[in-house]
């Protein structure tokens, strides 16, 4: 049979003119192969060689004008048949573009990004939260002894002019390393005019005692130079009548005295003393204006009251005369006393920090509540039947609590108050409960014999209801006189 040639499909409208030579060459090769099939074996071999050369020439002729764009593939089958497939590279790009939509714009909500609405209030709140974030400047360390810490603070104050808070902040910055902190102290200049509330109160108190004698004031504020005291005095002098702590305290005391006097007058009412005072006032009004003695006395009293109010320290500050005399007596003694007080203040602040740290740790542990640490409650159901152990336990509870049925019920655990009362009635004779109660009354007195006032009296033995287990159980020996017999 003649060999069948499979021709690859062509795309219509693309390169038909160029493929005419390849088609004619393929047809010639096919006719040569058909004629060779009917000839002798020798002729068949010759014609096969000619056909193969013709097909090779056709392939080269087809590839030359197309510049490598068209390709021919021939494969020999096991039975001698051959097949060829041809395809074009130019058509592959167009088909892929058609499959993927041509690479155009993608329209639709699924291709768009979701942009949140602009909220200026939320933005301002976030910026405010960032601004309000605090920074930790000091935290105590257990590995650092108090003696080393006091020595470090003294060096920072005397040599470099740091106050206690600044020195501790530097130490915390270097992770509680004293050597690094001491080496870094000269590299910074502390703010010299930083006046805390305590410093301002001490200055006002010292100024009320010593006036403008600044070297005396410096004895109460040893970490301040005289130049700093003078500078603060002139800035404090301008606003003294408005913002002075001592003046506010004096005005407050004066207002409290006036209110107390008004309350006393309202409480007394129109009594004979008020009438006499009113008469005295009228008589004073009748005095000629030349006599101004009472007015002078009032002015003297008012000035004395003002002086007394100014001499008193502000609220929360206590000064004794001995301490003031010790500070004012000698400069060295004043420095020693103030240094001791400063050390005490440092130790107290350190204790406060340790307590705060301990409290914060305990609060972190209690974030989940106390339920994990609570012991499981054993809930026992009430049982109407009395075992031997429960009977003995009830008798011992009666010996201790008397007629307190609630306490006896709590001791037993699985018996209610009503069941305890029934036990009193049903087992009175068996356990000699009357004698046990008499012993309890003799020990605690007769005032508590009736038990709590909200409990009802126990029924008499005549009206008692016998429990079924009383008939079934064997007689039990007396608890107080238990013997082998």
UniProtKB/Swiss-Prot annotation:
The modification Phosphoserine is found at residues 127, 260, 460. Transmembrane segments: none annotated. Phosphorylated by HSV-1 protein kinases in case of infection. SUPFAM superfamilies: Homeodomain-like. InterPro entries: ELM2_dom, Homeodomain-like_sf, REST_helical, SANT/Myb, SANT_dom, Trans_reg/Corepressor. Residues 1-26, 49-110, 244-314, 442-485 are annotated as: Disordered. Keywords: Chromatin regulator, Coiled coil, Host-virus interaction, Isopeptide bond, Nucleus, Phosphoprotein, Repeat, Repressor, Transcription, Transcription regulation, Ubl conjugation. Pfam families: ELM2, Myb_DNA-binding, REST_helical. Residues 49-64, 74-95 have a biased composition (Low complexity). The keyword Transmembrane does not apply. GO terms for biological process: chromatin organization; erythrocyte differentiation; negative regulation of DNA-templated transcription; negative regulation of gene expression; positive regulation of megakaryocyte differentiation; regulation of transcription by RNA polymerase II. Changing residue 106 to A: Reduces BCR(KBTBD4)-mediated proteasomal degradation. Residues 450-463 have a biased composition (Polar residues). Residues 103-189 form the ELM2 domain. Gene3D superfamilies: 1.20.58.1880, 4.10.1240.50, Homeodomain-like. It is found in: Nucleus. One of its GO terms (molecular function) is chromatin binding. It comes from the Eukaryota. The keyword Ubl conjugation applies. Residues 278-288 have a biased composition (Basic and acidic residues). Belongs to the CoREST family. Essential component of the BHC complex, a corepressor complex that represses transcription of neuron-specific genes in non-neuronal cells. The BHC complex is recruited at RE1/NRSE sites by REST and acts by deacetylating and demethylating specific sites on histones, thereby acting as a chromatin modifier. In the BHC complex, it serves as a molecular beacon for the recruitment of molecular machinery, including MeCP2 and SUV39H1, that imposes silencing across a chromosomal interval. Interacts directly with GFI1 and GFI1B in a RCOR/GFI/KDM1A/HDAC complex. Interacts with INMS1. Component of a BHC histone deacetylase complex that contains HDAC1, HDAC2, HMG20B/BRAF35, KDM1A, RCOR1/CoREST and PHF21A/BHC80. The BHC complex may also contain ZMYM2, ZNF217, ZMYM3, GSE1 and GTF2I. Interacts with REST. Interacts with the SMARCE1/BAF57, suggesting that the BHC complex may recruit the ATP-dependent chromatin-remodeling SWI-SNF complex. Interacts with SOX2. The SANT domains may bridge the nucleosomal substrates and the demethylase KDM1A. This is REST corepressor 1. It comes from Homo sapiens (Human).
């Amino acid at each position: 049979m003649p060999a069948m040639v499979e021709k690859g499909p062509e795309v219509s409208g693309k390169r038909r003119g160029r493929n005419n030579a390849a088609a004619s060459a393929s047809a010639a090769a096919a006719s040569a192969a058909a004629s060779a099939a009917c000839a002798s074996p020798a002729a068949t071999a010759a014609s096969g060689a000619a056909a193969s050369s013709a097909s090779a020439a056709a392939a080269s002729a087809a590839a030359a004008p197309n510049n490598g764009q068209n390709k021919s593939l021939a494969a020999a089958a096991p039975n001698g048949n051959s097949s060829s497939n041809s395809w074009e590279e130019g058509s592959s790009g167009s088909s892929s573009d058609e499959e993927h939509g041509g690479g155009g714009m993608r329209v639709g909500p699924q291709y768009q990004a979701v942009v949140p609405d602009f909220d200026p209030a939320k933005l301002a709140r976030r910026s405010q939260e960032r601004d309000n974030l605090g920074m930790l400047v000091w935290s105590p360390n257990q590995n650092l002894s108090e003696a080393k810490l006091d020595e470090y603070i003294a060096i920072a104050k005397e040599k470099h002019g740091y106050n206690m808070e600044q020195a501790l902040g530097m130490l915390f910055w270097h992770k509680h390393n004293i050597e690094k902190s001491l080496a870094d102290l000269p590299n910074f200049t502390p703010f010299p005019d930083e006046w805390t509330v305590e410093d301002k109160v001490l200055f006002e108190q010292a100024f009320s005692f010593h006036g403008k004698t600044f070297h005396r004031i410096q004895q109460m504020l040893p970490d301040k130079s005289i130049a700093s005291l003078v500078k603060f005095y002139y800035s404090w002098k301008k606003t003294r009548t408005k913002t002075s702590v001592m003046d506010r305290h004096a005005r407050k005391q004066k207002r409290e005295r006036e209110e107390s006097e008004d309350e006393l007058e309202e409480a007394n009412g129109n009594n004979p003393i008020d009438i006499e005072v009113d008469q005295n006032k009228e008589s004073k009004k009748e005095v000629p204006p030349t006599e101004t003695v009472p007015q002078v006395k009032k002015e003297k009293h008012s000035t004395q009251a003002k002086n007394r109010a100014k001499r008193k320290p502000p609220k929360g500050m206590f000064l004794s005369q001995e301490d003031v005399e010790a500070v004012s007596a000698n400069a060295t003694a004043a420095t020693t006393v103030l240094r001791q007080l400063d050390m005490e203040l440092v130790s107290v602040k350190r204790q406060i920090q340790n307590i705060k740290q301990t409290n914060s740790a305990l609060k972190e542990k209690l974030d989940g509540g106390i339920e994990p640490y609570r012991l499981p409650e054993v809930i026992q159901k009430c049982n109407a039947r009395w075992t031997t152990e429960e009977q003995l336990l009830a008798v011992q509870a009666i010996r201790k609590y008397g007629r307190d049925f609630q306490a006896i019920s709590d001791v037993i655990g699985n018996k209610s108050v009503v069941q305890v009362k029934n036990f009193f009635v049903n087992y009175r004779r068996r356990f000699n409960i009357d004698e046990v109660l008499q012993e309890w009354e003799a020990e605690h007195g007769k005032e508590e014999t009736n038990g709590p006032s909200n409990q009802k009296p126990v029924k008499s033995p005549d009206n008692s209801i016998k429990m079924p287990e009383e008939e079934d159980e064997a007689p039990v020996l007396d608890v107080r006189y238990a013997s082998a017999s």
